[in-house]
Amino acid sequence: MECLRSLPCLLPRAMRLPRRTLCALALDLTSVARPVAACGRAANLVGRSRAAQLCGPGRLRVAGEVHRLRTSDVSQATLASVAPVFTVTKFDKQGNVTSFEKKKTELYQELGLQARDLRFQHVMSITVRNNRIIMRMEYLKAVITPECLLILDYRNLNLEQWLFRELPSQLSGEGQLVTYPLPFEFRAIEALLQYWINTLQGKLSILQPLILETLDALVDPKHSSVDRSKLHILLQNGKSLSELETDIKIFKESILEILDEEELLEELCLSKWSDPQVFEKSSAGIDHAEEMELLLENYYRLADDLSNAARELRVLIDDSQSIIFINLDSHRNVMMRLNLQLTMGTFSLSLFGLMGVAFGMNLESSLEEDHRIFWLIIGIMFMGSGLIWRRLLSFLGRQLEAPLPPMV
């Protein structure tokens, strides 16, 4: 009896199946065994063979597969429930704007992308996946299709003015974009590149006057000492300038990587491969790949100009730093020379001060009785000290004179 009682607990462990699956198999066996019991011993044997088939490895394997499928469905449903939600802003060819929220899984399935394509990265990149252009510009992420432009998660980025005032007019052709006669993806790429170039230009226009003002205050010859607060401000501005130079460098490298690969230029022309009419126009006269190359080269030159301006500021900072070091060395040399002069004066005075020490000893002489001898000794001490000090100063001056340049 005890063995029968422990059988429900031991059977799932022995079969390595969940209890629910065993219960389902037991119900199938009982439904088959009931008609078998009414047909005698032969029917009983047939029922046993049928039960053996139901409990065989094939039947158990099917049950395990069903259980795994149910588990995978549950896990997928759980992942879908916790998937991040994107705030998507959609711009069409006419400049119409619509905003909506969509889960990440639904979004990349709808666009035909992979989950890794929608990951946020702070490094700028331009990639093409499944006839979709994915542009990452630090905090800005955009997906360009032949029909629309999608901006993902623009909140808390201070982009409202550009998104809802400037970008729709640029995409609809009312702005000052040079790619208006070309397909939609050209206007979208140019609008995003123009925004990023303007952002970098704005950072440079803020840093440039601050750096120049600080440098003028530091290298001013009227000030004999260096203001530490100005040096601290210059250090902070130098760090900001280094970050700006890094951003410009990454921007140039991203564009240059595309310009070096003709296949990437062809892939950026989305409408060429999705619209037969555009493909015929591109094959007949207007080469969209060349237009894309000209567009990227234009913004590469603009980024190169920004890089040169930032490099000039860096050179000014380095030159000013050299001037500051020279001034500090000059002040240090003056202080060292003054210290040396005072040391030589002290030595001269101490040397002739030995005469006074001789009179301070307990020696008998008749000179102490004459008051004129006191002033005579004092005069000799100061005169001798002055002569020796002057001699030492002339020697120091000869030693510190700059050597003459060699004759050519």
Curated annotation (Swiss-Prot):
Enumerate the Mitochondrial matrix topological stretches.
63-339, 402-408
GO function terms (MF aspect): magnesium ion transmembrane transporter activity
Supply the Pfam families for this chain. MRS2-like
Coarse class of the protein's main subcellular location: mitochondrion
User: Which GO terms of type biological process are on file?
Assistant: mitochondrial magnesium ion transmembrane transport
Q: Where is the transit peptide?
A: 1-62
What controls how active this protein is? Answer: May be regulated by calcium ions.
Q: Which InterPro entries match?
A: MRS2-like
* Chain positions of motif GMN motif: 360-362
Q: List the disulfide bonds.
A: none
Q: Which GO terms describe its cellular component?
A: mitochondrial inner membrane; mitochondrion
- Is Ubl conjugation given among the entry's keywords? no
| Protein topology in the membrane | Multi-pass membrane protein
Compartments reported by the entry = Mitochondrion inner membrane
Sites binding Mg(2+) 1 sit at E243, T246, D247, E312
Any idea which UniProt keywords this protein has? Ion transport, Magnesium, Membrane, Metal-binding, Mitochondrion, Mitochondrion inner membrane, Transit peptide, Transmembrane, Transmembrane helix, Transport
Q: Which residues does Mg(2+) 3 bind?
A: G360, N362
Write out the residues that bind Mg(2+) 2: D329
Name the residues that span the membrane.
Answer: 340-359, 371-401
The text of the family note is:
Belongs to the CorA metal ion transporter (MIT) (TC 1.A.35) family.
- Function recorded in the entry: Magnesium transporter that mediates the influx of magnesium into the mitochondrial matrix and regulates magnesium metabolism. Also permeable to calcium, sodium and potassium ions. Required for normal expression of the mitochondrial respiratory complex I subunits. May play a role in maintaining the inner mitochondrial membrane potential.
Q: What is known of its domains?
A: The GMN motif acts as an ion selectivity filter.
- Tell me the PANTHER family matching this sequence: MAGNESIUM TRANSPORTER MRS2 HOMOLOG, MITOCHONDRIAL, RNA SPLICING PROTEIN MRS2, MITOCHONDRIAL
Instruction: Tell me the protein's name.
Output: Magnesium transporter MRS2 homolog, mitochondrial
